[in-house]
Amino acid sequence: MSEEGSPMYSPFFGVMGAASAMVFSALGAAYGTAKSGVGISAMSVMRPELIMKCIIPVVMAGIIAIYGLVVAVLIAGKLDEAPTYTLYQGFVHMGAGLSVGLSGLAAGFAIGIVGDAGVRGTAQQPRLYVGMILILIFAEVLGLYGLIVAIFLYTKTSS
């Protein structure tokens, strides 16, 4: 055991924060991409000219993984060995990773479901496209909220 505020297991929590940021965000992005991709594939049989217009849900789902990557890289850059890496830093980094990771997971699920239904509906009624985009923006913002909170938490360990 090292100092009181810095036990030897304190970096474990930072590593778990970085891992959870990337893993959960990637899971959300993968689900959103897969679910939207299935909808685009089904829609393109009837209306192949709409493929490029309806690729937006897949792009938005991919952005969710970038949020997790940014936070994971930030946390990994601050990781250090136990005497210099405190338990406080480990817990804050874990909170930041869970914040962006779980919000990315939720956003990816929302983007996938909305994207799937939206592109299928757009194939039948093109006026639904604008509504789908608006709903996708609101789903994407869920992941952005997690990124903002994670960066805010991350900055608390800088001083």
Swiss-Prot record:
Membrane topology: Multi-pass membrane protein
Protein origin, superkingdom: Eukaryota
Oligomer status and interactors: V-ATPase is a heteromultimeric enzyme made up of two complexes: the ATP-hydrolytic V1 complex and the proton translocation V0 complex. The V1 complex consists of three catalytic AB heterodimers that form a heterohexamer, three peripheral stalks each consisting of EG heterodimers, one central rotor including subunits D and F, and the regulatory subunits C and H. The proton translocation complex V0 consists of the proton transport subunit a, a ring of proteolipid subunits c9c'', rotary subunit d, subunits e and f, and two accessory subunits.
Lineage of source species: Eukaryota, Metazoa, Ecdysozoa, Arthropoda, Crustacea
Site positions (Essential for proton translocation): E140
Keyword Magnesium in annotation: no
Protein name: V-type proton ATPase 16 kDa proteolipid subunit c
Keyword Cell cycle tagged: no
GO CC terms, sorted: proton-transporting V-type ATPase, V0 domain; vacuolar membrane
Keywords assigned: Hydrogen ion transport, Ion transport, Membrane, Transmembrane, Transmembrane helix, Transport, Vacuole
Localisation per UniProt entry: Vacuole membrane
InterPro entries, per the entry: ATPase_proteolipid_c-like_dom, ATPase_proteolipid_csu, ATPase_proteolipid_su_C_euk, F/V-ATP_Csub_sf
The protein's role, per its UniProt record: Proton-conducting pore forming subunit of the V0 complex of vacuolar(H+)-ATPase (V-ATPase), a multisubunit enzyme composed of a peripheral complex (V1) that hydrolyzes ATP and a membrane integral complex (V0) that translocates protons. V-ATPase is responsible for acidifying and maintaining the pH of intracellular compartments and in some cell types, is targeted to the plasma membrane, where it is responsible for acidifying the extracellular environment.
Major localization class: membrane
Cytoplasmic side: 33-54, 115-132
Cross-referenced Pfam families: ATP-synt_C
SUPFAM superfamilies from the UniProt entry: F1F0 ATP synthase subunit C
Transmembrane segments: 12-32, 55-75, 94-114, 133-153
GO molecular function: proton-transporting ATPase activity, rotational mechanism
Residue ranges annotated as Lumenal topological domain: 1-11, 76-93, 154-159
Organism expressing this protein natively: Nephrops norvegicus
Family named by the database record: Belongs to the V-ATPase proteolipid subunit family.
